[in-house]
Amino acid sequence: MAKRKEVILQETLNTQEAWEVAMNSGKLYVVDAHQKWCGPCTAIVGMLKRIKNELGDDLLRFATAQVDVIDTLEQYRGKCEPNFLFYGGGELVAAVRGCNAPLVQETIQETLKNEHKILSGEMERKVFRDVYSDTPDQEEEEEDEEEEEGGVVSKQITVALIKPDVVQNGQVDEILQKISEAGIEVLADEERMLTVEEARDFYKNKEEEEYFDQLIDYVTSGPCRVLVLTKGESGEGVVTLWRDIIGPFDAAVAKEENPDSLRAIYGTDATSNALHGSSSTEEAVRELGFFFPDFKPPTYRSAKSAASRASGRRSKTPSQKPRLQRTLAIIRPDALQAHKDSILQKIDEAGFKIAMQKEMVLTREQAESFYSEHKDTDYFEPLVKQMTCGPVLALCLAHDDAVDHWRSMLGPKVVADAVEEQPDSLRAQFRVEEAEVNMLHGSDSAEAAEEELSKIFHVEQTLAVIKPDAIDEKEQIMGKLKEAGFMISCQKDMNLSKEIASEIYKSKEGSEYYDHLIDHMTSGPTLMMVLSAENAVEKLRDIMGPTDPEVAKESHPESLRAMFAKSILENAIHSPSTNESAQEKIRIVFGDAQFDWDVNDMQAEEGEVNETSGEQPTDEQSGETEKTEEDGEHEGAQSDQQQAVSEAMEKEE
């Protein structure tokens, strides 16, 4: 028996030629226009299949299109939310923003009906003007309205990659010095060994180039240094500035056209070009998520919205519509008992990161308070009853446009509608037949998400310092911190100057052990981190363990000091003992910038700026703190001094 030919639901339009063929076909095309790196919207496929089967209309076509490679769709590049575009006779006749299944279905029916009338001569086609193709003047008017609102926005960032040969040649410090001289701030600095798979994913925009395989071999030949960069108060222009500094992609061309550029100095050709820089603000956000999924850029308060100019063209930035968001998900009791593992697997497959989670039993009062806005609805009582009949699992989910992405996966709130319109949605798949409400909650806006998350998760921030004696184990320590549920909101490698170390230990100035404490903390590089978690201050101190590593090994063998400390003096990690002290130390190290998950409002009063405390120490300052190996051994051998320092640190911490 002959094998049945598979029917393709959605055509794949991934070249300009394929696009033009489709647009010249005379059909009505419903196009899921998506970024290559995030793929098409899968939550709506079930509905499209049902519509195709029910209507059976040959005029109707479904397709997916990568906006990255189709010039006609250039204005949709960098738009992370789903865009469903309706083309009749090659003209745009309608558009639906976001995965709104009922609206997509309604628009399909309406535009199909109109196309039949147009083809029969009953009406003329009306071309739809999409807001994404507005003129620069129209965009600027909209942005001016947004700027009047003001508010706290994220600083713009770019991602830099110092490639393996430069790292192996010991030229990283030279480049870091040039970065500092250009007025660029390093927000994060991490050594990373890329796998072949990671490198192919990162450079997928180069996969059609002849040198692609050589490029992959090159960037995986040794460790890279990955940097997150910003500049000034807002970070505006840092993408363009960094690309100007590194020069043309092909280092051979750079040597001819821009001999002072970093690629001209450190690179050889298009493959071995020494450095990487994000090509746009949108790419910077994608690359930030690729290398530092937990990292949130600092924010600043501005009277203007954070609109950027990328390559001379004004465009909306991630800070106006954040691409990296968090949202609250709740698995209700019946589903938690019956489908927990399956739901968590779906969340993982969709690319969400679970930043925090908490299983809890709500009282009736708590449930009523949480859903107070629904108090006058028919489903309020069944909802409260469901939320209090057993434990719920609350999840903080992180993803690009997390709020919309999670809600698109959930489907309609009414279970019957979800089953009918989006049978592949989570509310349809994991319904409980006897329940009167759906089994999954999702915040309906970014503002609601923040409010709801604050009700569930009582987040604090604290400072963690990986000391010079444990800096070689920083990756393992950071891994342990992440496993314990901490989010790294910001990090900075520093060679502490005596000035900054003195500020951190200011309360111990004048004591007999003060100089030894300062000498130890300035004896080599440290890693400063702002950690966010529920009850972060107390939680981190529990994980660190006792000051004396021998005591830690006996009483807290799983603690960080039991695993990584060498002695009482060299005990791996430090953190403040109170929330007030933590906020003070964060200001000393990172200045007055705001960091995401800041529940203590670390915002400085307007006009007050600490100009020095957040600076990266210069090479000159670092040189003042250099110590010989013999000096370190001599200090480590002085047990009386170690004990004095230990007592000081116990009091300080």
UniProtKB/Swiss-Prot annotation:
It comes from the Eukaryota. Testis-specific. It comes from Ciona intestinalis (Transparent sea squirt). Keywords: Developmental protein, Differentiation, Disulfide bond, Redox-active center, Spermatogenesis. Residues 9-114 form the Thioredoxin domain. Contains 3 inactive NDK domains that each lack the active His residue, suggesting that they have no NDP kinase activity. Residues 155-299 are annotated as: NDK 1. GO terms for biological process: cell differentiation; CTP biosynthetic process; GTP biosynthetic process; spermatogenesis; UTP biosynthetic process. This is Thioredoxin domain-containing protein 3 homolog. SUPFAM superfamilies: Nucleoside diphosphate kinase, NDK, Thioredoxin-like. It holds the Pfam family NDK. Residues 300-323, 603-653 are annotated as: Disordered.
